[in-house]
Design a protein with these regions (language model features):
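Pepsin/retropepsin-fold aspartyl endopeptidases
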Residues: 22-388
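Bacterial Sec-dependent N-terminal signal peptides
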Residues: 1-28
Length: 388
């Protein structure tokens, strides 16, 4: 009896000494730390699926999708169809399939993951990725994005140390793995989507603009007609685009002021990947919580309306065309005009690539340049400018 009491006492002492430390290690276990590349404002990470080593864009606003040829290589199995809308509001049906033995980083494993089967996309090909990883790929984890070190940290099954459930706000969509949260714009509340697949800080829904324009201090600074961007379903139809200045948006306890943005035809306003410049984002998919830990306290002035070229050019109809025209250019060019030269760079041998065109435009020094358009067998040189 005495021996049993001594052994019990020893076990209790060992638990008191080591138990707390062991529990701490379990609760704060880091499943994996994954360095990411940031290429054309896309977060890209390595992924291995059924022995196929590849890369994916991390897209917290989308569903997992894989290009058809790579899905075949992964020996994907058909799983029906799904319908989604892209950034241009274009709905399209996609076949779905299951892929097996998914490894994200070294330790995070998924036995079976459903993916949309996407057509071959030159944008994905240019980036060297198989497709996009949506929130559904991280449904059994807690994901931290830390832009200071360009890492994603995947915790399982618990949140990072010292992070309480009450430190975050609820994800609004209980049925999907999209990161919808509530933010405050001036005195109004609005539902937004945190979307790492979106390039800028803020992409403002035209529906939210129509709802809030008369009861807030939103200012329209410019206007255009054209295509918002290339989406999964390709180029959208031309729409009216507004350039806006938003006085204030508060994400949890952090206030951003003087925010410039453009409008989109999406149903929801989007906070994009640029949020990561200002703090860590943690998404607890299992408990449906969102955390934003700003690097600096106090207000951050975002500098007002964005400075953009007064025309946009994209590959379209097997050539390069003007796809967005801001008001200062509406009497000089037309939607669909063929562009054959940008500031001295001939496009005759340029690949039909959005990335290639963006690189040429970004290389123009200063705030002015020129394009040469070809129309009715006539070539015309036209000055272009950056403007707010």
């Amino acid at each position: 009896m005495k021996r049993a009491e001594i052994l019990t006492g020893l076990w209790l002492l060992m638990f008191l000494i080591y138990g707390k430390e062991c529990m701490s290690q379990i609760q704060n276990k880091v499943c994996d730390t994954i360095p990411y590349e940031l290429v054309h404002n896309k977060i890209i990470i390595p992924v291995t699926i059924n022995g196929v080593k590849t890369k994916y864009i991390v897209d917290t606003g989308g569903k997992t999708g894989t290009m058809y040829d790579i899905a075949l290589e992964m020996q994907a199995n058909a799983a029906g169809y799904t319908r989604i809308s892209d950034v241009n509001g274009q709905g399209q049906n996609y076949q779905e399939a299951y892929v097996s033995n998914v490894s994200i980083g070294n330790s995070y494993q998924i036995k079976l993951l459903k993916t949309m089967v996407l057509p071959k996309d030159p944008f994905f090909t240019d980036l060297g990725v198989a497709g996009i990883l949506g929130g559904d790929a991280f449904s059994q984890s807690v994901v931290t994005f830390d832009s200071r070190y360009r890492i994603m940290v995947i915790n399982y099954p618990y949140r990072p140390e010292k992070l309480k459930l009450t430190d975050g706000v609820p994800l609004l969509d209980e049925t999907e793995y999209n990161s919808f949260i509530t933010v405050k714009q001036e005195e109004q509340t609005m539902k937004i989507l945190f979307d790492t697949g979106a390039e800028s800080f803020l992409l403002y829904s035209i529906q939210d603009y129509n709802r809030l324009a008369d009861i807030s201090d939103i200012k329209e600074t410019n206007h255009a007609h054209g295509i918002v961007s290339a989406g999964l379903a390709g180029l959208g139809n031309p729409v009216e685009i507004k350039k806006l200045n938003i006085p204030s948006i508060r994400i949890m306890d952090k206030e951003f002021t003087n925010i410039g943005c453009t409008t989109s035809v999406m149903n929801e306003t989007i906070i994009g990947v640029d949020l990561l410049k200002y703090g860590k984002v943690i998404i607890d998919y299992m408990r449906k919580r969102f955390f934003f830990l700003p690097f600096e306290k106090g207000k951050t002035d975002m500098g007002g309306a964005p400075v953009l070229w007064n025309v946009s050019i994209l590959p379209r109809n097997e050539r390069f065309e003007i796809t967005t025209i801001w008001d200062s250019m509406k009497d000089q060019v037309s939607f669909g005009d063929q562009v054959i030269n940008i500031n001295g760079t001939s496009l005759s041998n340029c690949p039909m690539s959005q990335i290639a065109i963006e690189e040429i435009m970004n290389a123009i020094p200063g705030d002015t340049g020129y394009i040469i358009i070809k129309k009715d067998n006539q070539e015309r040189k036209i000055e272009i400018k950056k403007e707010r």
